[in-house]
């Protein structure tokens, strides 16, 4: 995306390249929804908000998948969903290659992402923009040469892309579950700094198990909570169920098992965790094989059914957040 006119930007002794010009982008509008943080509070257009979301990590896999998500946003919104998460790279089995080897955004995938963000903004919804996915996925097979500097460039390019399009209803996860940090020892603090160097107002999350850096704006998923800052569970699954383990994966099978299928106990635990994080923290984003499975089993960008084998899906959870008391 940013390959023609570049200028250097230095921070912390590093140098990254940012665009002087790019393809035509939407005109900045005063009526854009804007996400901010005030202390431990998340705010949308200045009003406190609790995150209630669905993890659509494979939404960029095809034009049809992107279109299906957009077509169902109103339905998700009707249940109280106000947030979706979309990943530029990954996720497991989906293998979206949203970053090119030079750390720029692939224009095919970024165009899909922009459509989703615009559609979400029109519905007063928030988008978690996920960047690096360094786990079990073919998404990184062309990036073996990357270094810390390349990772920083990727995050900086992502934030620049968001800024140029005036996408303000977003926050950014630089490194999903600290996977790149664990595999390559790349420092997430530097990635966050790279993003903030481009746009200090961009909300940068921390998503790893080690001590969060001071420059993280909020903690999500794997991160320990940060005193005085928000925390969101951004990949919520049924606790104590080995959901991402043998329940949904099998050696030698390059797709998920039990797609969109839940036991009664799983549902009960998922609902309890949802309430715990909405009432006791800043929100909850559900993750499901129903939403993430690649073809031919998914991705399913719709609610589906009651989570039984005959009627798989996450409608049961959506009905829970719609009907539960409280924020």
Where does each model-flagged region fall?
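Bacterial N-terminal signal peptides that target proteins for export
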Residues: 1-12
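Bacterial Sec-dependent signal peptides at the C-terminal "C-region" and cleavage site
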Residues: 16-31
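Extracellular glycoside hydrolase catalytic/binding regions
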Residues: 153-154, 159, 166-318, 322
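Short regulatory "switch" loops immediately downstream of catalytic or recognition motifs
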Residues: 1, 90-93, 237-242
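Active-site mouth of glycoside hydrolases
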Residues: 34-216, 225-229
């Amino acid at each position: 995306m940013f390959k023609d006119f570049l200028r250097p930007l230095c921070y912390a002794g590093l140098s990254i390249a940012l665009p002087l010009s790019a393809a035509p982008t939407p005109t900045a509008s005063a009526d854009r929804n804007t996400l901010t943080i005030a202390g431990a509070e998340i705010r949308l257009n200045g009003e406190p908000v609790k995150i209630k979301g669905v993890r659509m990590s494979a939404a960029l896999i095809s034009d049809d998948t992107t279109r299906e998500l957009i077509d169902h946003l109103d339905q998700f919104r009707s249940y109280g969903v106000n947030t979706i998460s979309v990943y530029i790279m990954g996720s497991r089995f989906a293998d979206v290659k949203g970053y090119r080897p030079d750390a720029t955004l692939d224009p095919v995938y970024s165009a899909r992402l922009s459509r989703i963000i615009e559609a979400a903004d029109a519905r007063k919804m928030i988008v978690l923009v996920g960047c690096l996915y360094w786990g079990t996925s073919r998404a990184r097979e062309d990036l073996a040469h990357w270094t810390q500097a390349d990772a920083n460039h990727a995050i900086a390019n992502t934030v620049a892309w968001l800024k140029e399009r005036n996408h303000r209803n977003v926050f950014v996860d630089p490194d999903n579950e600290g996977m790149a940090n664990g595999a390559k020892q790349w420092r997430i603090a530097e990635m966050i700094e790279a993003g903030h160097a481009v746009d200090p107002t961009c909300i940068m999350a921390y998503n790893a198990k080690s001590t969060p850096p001071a420059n993280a704006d909020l903690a999500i998923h794997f991160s320990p909570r940060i005193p005085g800052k928000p925390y969101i569970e951004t990949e919520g699954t049924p606790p104590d169920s080995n959901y991402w383990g043998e329940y949904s994966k099998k050696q030698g099978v390059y797709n998920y098992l039990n797609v969109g299928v839940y036991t009664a106990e799983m549902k009960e635990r998922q609902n309890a965790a949802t309430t715990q994080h909405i009432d006791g923290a800043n929100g909850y984003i559900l993750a499901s094989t129903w939403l993430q499975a690649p073809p031919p089993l998914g991705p399913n960008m719709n609610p589906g059914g009651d989570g039984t084998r005959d009627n798989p899906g996450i409608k049961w959870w959506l009905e829970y957040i719609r009907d539960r008391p409280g924020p």
